Curated annotation (Swiss-Prot):
Residues 20-41 are annotated as: Disordered. This is Transcription antitermination protein NusB. The keyword RNA-binding applies. One of its GO terms (molecular function) is RNA binding. One of its GO terms (biological process) is transcription antitermination. The keyword Translocase does not apply. Coiled coil: none annotated. Involved in transcription antitermination. Required for transcription of ribosomal RNA (rRNA) genes. Binds specifically to the boxA antiterminator sequence of the ribosomal RNA (rrn) operons. PANTHER family: ANTITERMINATION NUSB DOMAIN-CONTAINING PROTEIN (PTHR11078:SF3), N UTILIZATION SUBSTANCE PROTEIN B-RELATED (PTHR11078). Keywords: RNA-binding, Transcription, Transcription antitermination, Transcription regulation. InterPro entries: NusB-like_sf, NusB_fam, NusB_RsmB_TIM44. One of its GO terms (cellular component) is cytosol. Belongs to the NusB family.
C-alpha cells in the first residue's frame, strides 16, 4: 500500500478539505511583551513600574482601610514580587503621598469636575501618585508620569477611570511642570 499524501480535515461548514500530511509547522508567534489583553507582561515591567503598582495597592489600603503607613509598608514588602520593585521609589511614593495628602488634595481638587468623595479610591491614589511625582520626582519626564498613571488606572481602576486620570493629569502638568510642558509644546 502507498501512504496518502493528504489527510481530510473537518471544516466548520461540514465539508472536508485536503491538507498535506507533511505540512511544515509554523513556529510559535513571539509576543512583544504584551498579554492577550494588551497589558505589559510581568517580565517586561521596570522596577519603577513595579514600585508604582505596589505603592498604588498600599495607598488603596490607606484610603479604604485607614491603615497607618508603617503597617501597610510591612505588609506590602512581604508580597510576592516586591523584591523586583524599586524599593526607594516605592518608599518615596507611599510615605510622600500619605504625609503630603492634604497638599496633594489641594492641588488635585480644583481640577476635578466632582467632589473628591465621588472619586474612586484607585483613581484618588493614582492622582496622588501623579501629583507627587510631578512635584518631587523631577528626573521623571511629565509624559512618563502621565503614561504610568494611565496604565495603573487601566490595570486597577474602573472601566473609564484611565480617561479621567488622563484629563486631570494633563490639566495638572502645566502648573507643576511649566518649563517642561512649554518646551514640549514648542517641538
Amino acid at each position: 500500500m502507498h501512504k496518502p499524501l493528504f489527510q481530510k480535515t473537518f471544516i466548520t461548514n461540514r465539508r472536508f478539505m485536503a491538507e498535506p500530511l507533511n505540512k511544515p509547522k509554523r513556529p510559535p508567534q513571539i509576543r512583544t511583551g504584551l498579554t492577550d489583553t494588551g497589558v505589559k507582561k510581568a517580565a517586561d515591567k521596570s522596577a519603577r513600574t513595579r514600585a508604582r503598582e505596589f505603592a498604588l495597592q498600599a495607598l488603596y489600603q490607606h484610603l479604604v482601610g485607614r491603615n497607618d503607613a508603617d503597617s501597610i509598608d510591612a505588609f506590602t514588602r512581604d508580597l510576592v514580587g516586591f523584591h523586583k520593585a524599586d524599593s526607594a521609589h516605592y518608599d518615596a511614593l507611599l510615605h510622600g503621598c500619605i504625609e503630603g495628602a492634604s497638599a496633594l488634595d489641594a492641588v488635585i481638587t480644583p481640577l476635578l469636575d466632582r467632589p473628591m468623595a465621588e472619586i474612586s479610591p484607585v483613581e484618588h491614589a493614582v492622582l496622588w501618585m501623579g501629583a507627587y511625582e510631578f512635584r518631587q520626582c523631577l528626573d521623571v519626564p511629565y509624559r512618563v508620569v502621565i503614561n504610568e498613571c494611565i496604565e495603573l488606572a487601566k490595570a486597577f481602576g474602573g472601566t473609564d477611570g484611565h480617561k479621567y486620570v488622563n484629563g486631570v493629569l494633563h490639566k495638572m502638568a502645566p502648573s507643576l511642570r511649566a518649563a517642561e510642558v512649554a518646551a514640549d509644546q514648542t517641538k
